[in-house]
């Protein structure tokens, strides 16, 4: 059970423990506290899985340790809720698997064979000893006979000479015969000894062979039965854990149809394909048929029709091959011509900012470059052309971009974005500065009592309309100059002087706006005099300088003429300077 769980989870069984008999109503914090108290001495660990086993009527948990386990420290039980929880480690699991194996008669058979071999060896030894004893007895008998013959020879020597010669010959013959008999006996004894030794060795070899054969038969039988038990356990737990693994690994794939509808919020095919590849990795334990079924459940529309047609032609078509076919269909739909047309027809939306439009245009440009519809060397030129023709840049930015286009130095993507940011910031600061100048208008001095009485009312009106204030101020100044100026030729100088100061023409007058626009364009970002604060300072100086400097000489001359006309009426007027 432990090995099967570890094989399914892909962990090392030697560094894992299996905890059984965990109550179903045991809370997570109670389980963690009990496991921590019992397993913390073994080292760092993590709980891989904790599931309810219907056949056990309780939960089971698989725990993996970071390092090898010390078998002497592994607890057999864990004190927890509902009673002790059983702990199973790898050696205990192997013992539990083999403890129910019945004892076979192979070992007694081996002992009987060994016992028979021992008896045969003992009999061989006894036979060899008996044969050796017989040989010794024969040898002693031969010696006795030889002694007797020798004695007879001695008697013959003591007798007559003839008899002595005959007896000597007989003694010699007897000695020779005795010697021959003794030699034969010795040879027989040696042969007996060798035979005994051979029988003993044969019996010993037979006994050893019997013992080895018995042990081999017993080991083979034990391995066969043990393998059968392990295989039975493996199949049982595989059938039990298969639904669990399917439940853990099965996660629905996001839907994909391949439709292109304006209101459709479906994700792109590239992102869906990456997610599908990851899901196939999680479905590795499922069968190929189940993987195809799950893939078909996530498809709809054109994508479903394509995969269904492929499976009708080849029922053994794998899920990976289905993804490959979908990639060939949906990735190749944007040809180089389609990508180029999408880029060339991209237009700035009504509520879309210029910065956002340029970013969206860049995405289409990069796709066109990938498809080969646009050469990379022409990317900056085409980007600038599309911004000028399909976007709505400000006049200052448009002049700057057109000058870059004529000079054949189009900006790249990042430089164009910086230029747009700088232009937007400059336009905002210019608008704030112009609004501040219109509110802080300089007061106008006037000798007309009616104009002086009307000045508070004009001030209130100027607060309501800053443009009307400038127009009223210019009109009052023109009236005063026309009243005090000489009748001959001086009326033409006053408007000219006012126009030179920039106060004689109102902002709403014809010709005023182009002059202001021209100055703004010259000082735009990227222009010849790019200083955003320059126009603000010039405008402030024009607003702060009172329009009375050009009128002072005219007023003084008119006052002198009035005094001379009153004091010297009838006298000719002397030329000035005398």
UniProtKB/Swiss-Prot annotation:
Task: Extract the Pfam families matched here.
Answer: PNMA, PNMA_N
- Residue ranges annotated as compositionally biased, kind Acidic residues, are 462-473, 556-566
InterPro entries (alphabetical): PNMA, PNMA_C, PNMA_N
Compositional bias of kind Gly residues: 147-159, 174-211
Which residue windows does the record flag with biased composition (Low complexity)?
Answer: 112-129, 160-173, 449-461
**Organism's domain of life?**
Eukaryota
Sequence segments annotated as region (Disordered): 106-221, 441-578
Report the leader peptide range.
none
Full protein name: Paraneoplastic antigen Ma6F
Organism name: Homo sapiens (Human)
Q: What is the lineage of its organism?
A: Eukaryota, Metazoa, Chordata, Craniata, Vertebrata
Q: Which gene encodes it?
A: PNMA6F
